């Protein structure tokens, strides 16, 4: 039985609790309101898509959830930890031990093999999986000893995903993970994310402007102009192979 199925037998626990979150940037004499009172939850084992156009506040929200940025006002908690009151060291430890990040660009170390790129994380994690196990989860068992230059874009992104999950995070935050890929390659990457969510029960948030990707989520959170405008539940989820764009 997978970890996700075990969780499903219990009442879903809240991983993130967000209330009235705002973020304002000062750009010279101009104030830019990236978030204008966002409220949401993310639950254990859930896959959520944060959907909206460029400038809607998706990346800002994800960065605050991941401890990469702080809110101007409002409240955000990871389980029972109030991140709005966390010190810099507490946020560093939170990012290091609890959150996995996947970005549009892979940021692999060119002089290291796929296995070695993943090991960079596992060597400092508290309870890591083996690099080989992480790479196997994303379908790269036979590419572990290849360098980034020997891998396709989709394969490099899957190495980045393996690196993110290798520390056994409770949360996986993905910022436009298919943004630099064609649709066929992007679907393979989404299949890796779906497998991780299903088999490991890792709460997963994917931000995208691609409406089609929303079909694979448990819930879709729509953002517009810094506000969460709508939340939809997918009663029937699509598999990545059913997505087209």
Where are the predicted features?
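ABC family nucleotide-binding domain
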Residues: 14-223
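ABC-family P-loop ATPase nucleotide-binding domain
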Residues: 1-24, 229-245
